[in-house]
Amino acid sequence: MPEPFARALGWPDEPIGWSTLIAEARSERGWAAYGHPEWGPFMFGQTNPEFSTSGLSATVAEYLAAAGKREGLTLADVRAPKNRRVVRDLQRSVVHYGDTTLFFAEQMAARGPTYVSAVAMEEVTVLDYNLRLRTGGPRLVAISPEEGTFYSDNPLIVPDAPWVDADTRAAAEVVSERLISRMTPEVAAEAYFRPPDDAPPVAPVDAANGAAPTEPTALLGLPEPRVMNAIIEAWRADRKPARVEVGLDVSGSMVEEGKLEAAKQGVDGFVRLLQPQDEVGLSVFSDEPVVVAEPVPMRTGRARLLARVQGLFPEGDTALYDATDQAVARIAERAGDDRIDAVVVLSDGADNASDISFERLQERLREVSGDEGDGVRVFTIAYGSGAEAELLADIATSGGGRAYVGDSATIEQVYIEISSFF
């Protein structure tokens, strides 16, 4: 948590746990209850448990807290309506998900502490933020939840597989022994990690830099695999829903090298990954932007939207700026704190047909993305060798999202990575 936010909750004298965060997520007063209305509502951040270890650890811990347990979570616990409601209430305060906690740290460094009130992240990311990313504003402090937490290991294993011969296994043992012999507390701390045994961490893994070296005092137990699977299934149904507009370049250059056909397959896969409660719309742009489909719930509109995607064909110029501006305006008009609002734009070339300037577009994006985490985020894909990757990265930065680079061979994977935010 940003240190002032933690102190407002009584830290370090009073413990903070999942029960604290759940209570704040349910409160309508937000930080005004603690004399800080300028901090806005309580907003929580965690990564996607299907993509990220920290997100999975956080989600399991939430279910354990809801069930009042530290270990031994059962299928009945996960499926209990009371426990589902507890986790759902916390998830409704999420600003967005994602595949790495580093994105949260980068956004907090760029946009300030009101971007998110608390984030489930590894201690190493807290230290990285305080010692590398922070350029001003409060530091982050690592808080071990009073209910308990997990250690995240980085295991080294030698697969028991036909392609691992005796020489390979012997070489792996040499590497393993060398790593173990060299992994002193000092070496681990250089990368902001704790030592691999019970030895206490050393600087810079210390309280002066935001770490919690005397924690954790309680550890949680991971449930068995079938319970983990049930947690993921429940999270999919209960996570904060998204409202996304997909903007697709259909200019004449998209006919080259089968780019449009590959992009359509990427969009198809993206739409199929979203949950029934999510809403997705589609717009295309060439000489001018055109709305193909307003956002519709995937529960009822998925098949119809997929059919519209497959009916697209390329022609004309590239009105990238106008398309992005108008898509963001449409989503912003509907935006609220009940959904993750975003625009995903793919383009293979430079803008040559827009009325709005690049500079004005950036201003508009900063206005709707804002410094608080509940704005509209813009994700961009620079598609193919002719794309303006740097320009699209600037658009994503202004829009509080992330920039990606892809081609016909990788575009499906790019859309999968973007789906982690929802």
Language-model features: where?
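Ligand-binding pocket segment of bilobal, Venus flytrap-like solute-binding proteins
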Residues: A61-S144
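Periplasmic-binding protein-like
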Residues: S176-A199
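Von Willebrand factor
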Residues: R239-P297, F313, L320-V328, R339-S347, ...
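A conserved helix-loop-strand patch within extracytoplasmic ligand-binding domains
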Residues: M1-S52, V60, L64
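A bilobed periplasmic-binding-protein/Venus flytrap-type ligand-binding module shared by bacterial periplasmic
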Residues: M1-F5, S152-A171, T184-Y192
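Acidic, polar low-complexity linker/tail segments
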Residues: R194-V246, V250-E261, V290-V291, V296-T300, ...
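VWA/integrin I-like adhesion module and closely mimicked acidic/polar interface patches used
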Residues: G349-S398, Y404-A409, Y415-I418
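Extracytoplasmic/secreted cell-surface and envelope-processing proteins
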Residues: A8-G10, T53-G55, D128-N130, M254-E257, ...
